[in-house]
Structure formats: structure tokens, C-alpha cells
Amino acid sequence: MGRKKVEIKRIENKSSRQVTFSKRRNGLIEKARQLSILCESSIAVLVVSGSGKLYKSASGDNMSKIIDRYEIHHADELEALDLAEKTRNYLPLKELLEIVQSKLEESNVDNASVDTLISLEEQLETALSVTRARKTELMMGEVKSLQKTENLLREENQTLASQVGKKTFLVIEGDRGMSWENGSGNKVRETLPLLK
């Protein structure tokens, strides 16, 4: 008799959902560890629970090295896609430029008819508006990317500031505790005040 097939849908019972999450998260991390050992690969697993708690596991290299390698690889892919898109957009504009140049060369603008000049002007305006729209789109994408980076850095700064605050508090508390202890960590006995 085989295992019962479980229907994949949201578990309504909160405690059952938490237990399932915990078991499956541990299973996922174990499978990643096994894959890393069997195939000598670097694997990073990030899991965020429904409550927002982050669980992470890295095998082989540490998490930051794996993420850095991913970002470098992903940036190369994005550059290649961007170059392909620019090339695709460049060809129609190049063709339009060649048409305009040939029209200007084949007939003197002074001898061109009004209809020819109007058509030429419309083609140039169309090419210019397409170029401006693409430029605006690229600039807006860059602004969004910079805003996202700014937000990530701000969150990281807040996290680091809170960690520094906690460590400072622990150091201050530790210093207070040391005032009641001698160097060996044993408590110093208080002496009774002298009678007057």
C-alpha cells in the first residue's frame, strides 16, 4: 500500500499549518544538504514563514558568497538581455535613419515637394518620440532600482543599528555586573557599616 496523496492547498488549522511548515522546512533543508554533498554544489535555502520569520541554510560556501555569485551571474544575464533588446530597438531606428538619409541624398530638400517633406518630418517625429519614450522608460527603471536599493540599505542600517544598540546595552550591563565582582568573577562581600 502506497502513501496517501495529499491535496496541496492552504491548511486552515493554524497549529497543523505550523507543524507542517516546520517538518517540510526541515525536509527541504535536509534535501538541499544531501544534494550539496552528492553533487559537490553550493546551495542556499531561504525560507520566510507566514509570520515573517526568516530561516536560512547554506551548504558549502557561506550564504553571502552564494548570494554574491548569484548576483554577479544574474547581472551578466540582465546585461545580455538588455543588449539584445537595445539591438532589437536599434535596427528599426537605423533603418529609419537610412531612409531619411537616402531621401535627403536622392533629392535636394529645396526641390522636394511639400508632401515629401511632411512625410519625412512625421517619420522623424515618430522616431524621436519612440526614442524619448524608451529613454524615459529606462530612466524610470533606474530610479525604481535605486529606490529599491535605498530601501534595502535603510533596512540593513536599521538592523545593524539595533544590533549595535543591543550590544552596547549588554556591555554596559556587563560593566555594572563587574563592579560587584572581583577579577575572578566571585562576588565581593559587602562589609557592615561601622557603629558610631
Swiss-Prot record:
The keyword S-adenosyl-L-methionine is annotated on this UniProt entry: no
Segments forming domain MADS-box: 1-61
Tissue-specificity statement: Expressed in most plant tissues, roots, seedlings, leaves, stems, inflorescences, pollen, siliques and flowers.
One Gene Ontology term from the biological process aspect of the record: cell differentiation
K-box domain span: 80-170
Inducing factors: Requires EARLY FLOWERING 7 (ELF7) and ELF8 to be expressed. Up-regulated by HUA2.
GO cellular component: nucleus
Pfam families (alphabetical): K-box (PF01486), SRF-TF (PF00319)
Keyword tags: Developmental protein, Differentiation, DNA-binding, Flowering, Nucleus, Repressor, Transcription, Transcription regulation
Subcellular compartments: Nucleus
Effects seen without this gene: Early flowering.
Entry keyword DNA-binding: yes
GO molecular function: DNA-binding transcription factor activity; protein dimerization activity; RNA polymerase II transcription regulatory region sequence-specific DNA binding
Miscellaneous comment text of the record: Complex rearrangements within the MAF2-5 gene cluster plays a role in the variation of the flowering time, an ecologically important variable phenotype.
Function: Probable transcription factor that prevents vernalization by short periods of cold. Acts as a floral repressor.
Name by which UniProt lists this protein: Agamous-like MADS-box protein AGL31
Biological source species: Arabidopsis thaliana (Mouse-ear cress)
